[in-house]
Every structure is written in C-alpha cells, then in structure tokens.
Amino acid sequence: MSIDFSNFAYYKNEDMETNMTIRHSKTSDLPRLMEIFDVARSFMAETGNPKQWVDGYPSEEVIMEDIGNGDSYVVEKDDKVVATFVLREGDDPTYDIIYNGEWLNSEPYATIHRIATSGETKGIMHTVMQFAKQRHDNIRIDTHEDNKVMRHLIMKEDFKYCGVIRCWSGAERLAYQFSKHK
C-alpha cells in the first residue's frame, strides 16, 4: 500500500497490528508529553544511559518551540498519546561537522529528534520510521553512546552509522543516516 504524505496532518498506520496514528502535537498535549519524557528519562537511566536528557531536558520551552514550529508529532493508540518525536525538515547545524566518519550523501535531509515513548505500546520506532521514510529520502538521527536500546532500534530500521557529531551542548552523539539512494 502506497500512501502520499505530502499534505498531511494525520497518519494512520494500518499495516501495523497495533493500529497507531500520528498527528501534529498540540499545546494541549504538553502535560502528557512531559509525562512521556519523564518515563523515557527513567527508562534510559535503568538501561545504562543516565547521561542523556539530564537536568530536565527537554524542557517545556523546548517542546513548545517544537510545537510552534510544526515539527512535533504524537503517536496515538486508542486515542491515547503513547509517544512523541520531532521530525524537522532541512539542515541541522549540529550535523554540519561529523567526526570519525562521513554522511552517506550531502542531499537534503530531515532529522528525527527527541523520540520518546510511554512504554505502553510496542512498535513505536517502526511506525515513526515508516512515517518519516514515506516523506523523506534522507533521514538523519543521533543518540548517546550509552543508549544501546536506541542504537539497536536505529540500526534495525536500515540506518547506517556515519560518525560522531557534537550537539548544541557540546556533548558527543553517535550519528546515523537512512538514504533511499544508498
């Protein structure tokens, strides 16, 4: 089944047994998004990644900026928000310089940031990646070296490890890229 996402605000993944939907985040979603980020921070700490998303990151201000820019999305199952992520089109300045490797290509790309789940539903990463891949030929994503769960999920979705980038705080992140035109 081929779906055109060129003019979307809503996406229903009918291929997944879990029957999830994706839509733009709204300001009214903020309390639930903050709960989800709390759960994600706890999960990361419990699975050996206590250094990512510290000191209250992402803050309400960051999330509100993402919502205002139209980059923030939620994943719903049975009308309940179970995950969130940012899908941003265009160049990301933190990806301008890559160390110990190189990007697969220099074509236009989208970036996925701040993917987080409530832990209530499986298949979130696959649903998010299918959504992004339907819209973009090149997608970049990064994560902390200690985030072994995310690293595994990223590779499972046909991303290639490209090298190391430095995020706005100066912290190093492992960087990956998916390209339909390898």
What is each of the regions a protein language model found here?
Residues 21-35:
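A short beta-loop-alpha structural element at the N-terminal edge
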Residues 41-61:
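Conserved GNAT-fold acetyl-CoA-binding loop/helix
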Residues 61-74, 91-92:
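A short helix-loop-beta-strand connector motif used in the catalytic cores of GNAT acetyltransferases and
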Residues 74, 80-90:
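Conserved beta-strand in the GNAT
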Residues 86-120:
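Conserved acyl-donor/pantetheine-binding loop and adjacent beta-alpha core of acyl/acetyltransferases
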Residues 117-134, 152-156:
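Conserved acetyl-CoA-binding loop-helix of GNAT-fold acetyltransferases
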Residues 126, 146-163, 171:
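Conserved active-site alpha-helix within GNAT-family acetyltransferase domains
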Residues 135-146:
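Conserved GNAT acetyl-CoA-binding A-motif
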